[in-house]
């Protein structure tokens, strides 16, 4: 049979087609925003495609150096730096401007220098998201997000919850 788990690419493509098949191209929006703390731990710049007006698909870029890492509970060795790429999909629940935002995704972490410490290894972290989102109901406008992001840390074998605030522009 064509649709079995032996063909995950086909299953994935069918799921994407179903998810976005009803998307009205004229109602799809974009957003660019700055996030402090939250999913990228320190700060990040993010691009988001708002599909079907209620499904945000996000990719971002964040950065932390050794001095900043102390503030986020993960002290790195001297001169260590890490780039973070948060990728997520979510769901907006609400009417017009005020929404509950739920989401899930992962964070790719890339350390700039090799290290012997376990918390300084390249890898992927899983994350969730719950928060409040205000966005303009016009075609363009202001965007604000207040979020809680539980992030799974495999070294600690548990979740740490980070708060975040985002400010940006919807177009």
What are these regions (language model features)?
Residues 38-40, 93-97, 171:
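A generic beta-sheet turn/junction motif
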Residues 31-46, 53, 62-64, 116, ...:
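Solvent-exposed loop/turn segments connecting transmembrane beta-strands
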Residues 48-146:
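Gram-negative (and chloroplast) outer-membrane scaffold detector with strong preference
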Residues 28-30, 147-150:
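Extracytoplasmic loops and strand-loop junctions of Gram-negative outer membrane beta-barrel proteins
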Residues 1-29:
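Cleavable N-terminal export/targeting peptides
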Residues 40, 86, 148-150:
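Proline-rich low-complexity regions
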């Amino acid at each position: 049979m064509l649709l079995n788990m032996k063909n995950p690419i086909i299953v994935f493509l069918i799921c994407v087609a179903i998810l976005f098949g009803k998307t009205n191209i004229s109602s799809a929006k974009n957003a660019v925003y700055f996030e402090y703390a939250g999913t990228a731990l320190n700060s990040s710049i993010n691009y988001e495609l708002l599909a079907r007006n209620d499904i945000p698909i996000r990719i971002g870029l964040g950065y932390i150096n050794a001095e900043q890492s102390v503030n986020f509970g993960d002290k790195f060795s001297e001169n260590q730096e890490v780039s973070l790429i948060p990728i997520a999909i979510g769901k907006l629940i609400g009417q017009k401007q005020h929404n509950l935002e739920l989401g899930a995704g992962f964070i790719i972490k890339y350390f700039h220098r090799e290290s012997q410490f376990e918390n300084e290894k390249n890898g992927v972290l899983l994350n969730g998201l719950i928060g409040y989102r205000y966005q303009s109901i016009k075609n363009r406008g202001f965007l604000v997000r207040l979020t809680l992001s539980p992030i799974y840390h495999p070294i600690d074998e548990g979740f740490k919850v980070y708060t975040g605030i985002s400010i940006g522009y919807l177009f």
